Every structure is written in structure tokens, then in C-alpha cells.
Amino acid sequence: VPVSAVRVEVWSDIVCPWCYIGKRRFESALAEFDGEVEVEWRSFQLDPNAPVGRFQPTPDHLAAKMGASREQVEGMMGQVTAVAAEVGLEYDLMNSVSLNTFDAHRVLHLAKSHGLGTVAHERLMRANLVEARTLDTPTLVELAAEIGVPAQETERVLAGDEYAHEVREDFSQARRYGVSGVPFFVLNSAYGVSGAQPTEVFAQALQQAAQG
């Protein structure tokens, strides 16, 4: 059976610990897949109502959002940190900083226009979840420059509302697909894989999509 190229769209948020784990498991499946795959990262906000410009320690943010105790939050973070370690990610969630990620997603779309969408997604996830960086404007400019997006372009984009439309388009498309949580993978606009599934689930989905 001839294997055709597979197009994968991934809805993800850069503050989502399971999205980064899902990315690693998906990459393991990609490494073993013979066919050609084109990956496009799409924007999704776990917390679209987070106040813009407010940076809050993630444990405090989660405790308030979920009505959970600090101990419960620490327990949950410990569990996800252990899973992340299995795919080679060293999370520092207790020190991580939550924020409204809309501007970060605009930067991701700017990076995508330079052909750096996947690299940018990786860099911002690592900055938030592993390095516990505060993703304010200067930091977004610096991280984008690190991967090859000129600083003045990022500054210009963040000073206005460029790429806001593209980010909202991703949200609309997610709603059309019925995406309620991330990561969410759509293969050839036909097959959906929800969550940070085991690598073999992604491998199976890739085979299925490739065979049409």
C-alpha cells in the first residue's frame, strides 16, 4: 500500500504540561514512521480568561482555579513531573509562572511565518515548563530571537495586534472539531487523537492516516 504524506495539526498551549509530554511521545512515533509528515502547531488557550499582563506562580494559580489545597496541587504536579521525566523532560512546575498566553501564541504565529513554528513551540514550552521563565514581552522577544526571529519584528508584533486574527482562527477551528482539551492532534483533517497518548497510539494513527 503506497504511503502518502500525512498532515498533522496539533492544538496545544505552551503552559500545558501534558502538551509537552504529548509532543515528545508523538515525536517518538514520528521517528519510527516511514512516511512523510507535515506538522502544523495550532493555538489553544487552557485559560483564555487569565488576566492579560498578570504573572502568577502556577501552584497558586491552579489552587485558586481548581479550589484545591496547596498539597493537592503539589501532588498533581509531582505526578505529571514524574511522567515528564519518562520522556526526558525535567519539569520545574513548582517554580513555573502562569500567564495569559494570547501574546505568546501571536509570537508563535510570527515564528510560523518564518518557517519556525515547531521550533518556537518547543522553545516556549521549555522556557515555561522546564526553565520556569516568566514569559513577559522582553522574554518573548529574547526567546524568539534565539530561534531566529528578528527582535524588532517580535517587538512590533507585540506592540500591536498582528496575528491576533490567526490565533483566533485556530481557536475557532478547535471549536469546530469539538476540541475541549489539549494536546489534540488531527491527522489529514480526518483522524483525531486526544491527549498525551502512548507513542504506539500515535504510530497507529499515522499508519491509518497514511493509508487513507
Q: For each predicted feature, which ranges?
A:
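Structural alpha/beta surface segment adjacent to cysteine/selenocysteine redox centers
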Residues: 23-131
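C-terminal cap of thioredoxin/glutaredoxin-like
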Residues: 3-11, 15-37, 41, 108-212
